[in-house]
Amino acid sequence: MNHKRVERIWRREGLKVPKRQAKRKRLWLNDGSCIRLRPQYKDHVWSYDFVMTRTHDGRPIKILTLIDEFTRECLCIRVNRNITSWDVLEELSTLFITRGIPEHIRSDNGTEFTAKVVRKWLSELGVKTLFIEPGSPWENGYIESFNGKLRDELLNGEIFMTLLEAKILIESWRREYNEIRPHSALGYRPPAPEVICLQPKSATLSVVQ
């Protein structure tokens, strides 16, 4: 049954036909956001996302994961009860100072990533944001694959008694993933040895007020 027939039935029954909602568009920022960009070198494209889990008492844990799509290295995992756009900025600030600034960052349209303060700050540093189509996680395949490994290899098999325990075990897993775990796309070598340390690009890292 198509939508026109449904509307005819509604009118026949004297019901008000609801106005059609405009199809939600992905976020356009005039910076190539809708281009499916493939990573070509280190710091070309980073991507980040969230994973959810719980402690044994049922309280939620929110996990921010961030990777370099080219090297596959997990640059950080932040674990807390809640993570806001300001927490995202704090994590990015630390990485930009210690690792350098990427050309692009890919993410979904979560409010923590699309917040005006985050977009403005990244734009001022020259970082282009790549937002995927809503409901299309396959467009963010690198981080989705990483998050799947995190779930399968750790989260699904662990019962975290406390938030602190979760932080310790997840960070331990991240280090093993980077330094020991072989990756098929890297010739069955771990991501971290593939990383060439470059001098961070010069930039003033100030949080937008």
Residue ranges, per PLM feature:
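Mobile genetic element proteins and their domesticated derivatives, centered on retroelements
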Residues: 6, 10, 49, 66, ...
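Short, surface-exposed connector motifs at secondary-structure boundaries
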Residues: 71-75, 99-104
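Active-site beta-loop-alpha junctions of metal-dependent nucleic acid enzymes
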Residues: 59, 77-99, 111
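C-terminal domain-tail junction helix/linker
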Residues: 125-127, 149-209
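Basic, flexible linker segments flanking DNA-binding modules
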Residues: 1-45, 136, 190-201
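An active-site-proximal beta-strand-loop segment
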Residues: 44-75, 81-83
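RNase H-like polynucleotidyl transferase catalytic core
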Residues: 19-22, 105-109, 124-142, 158-163
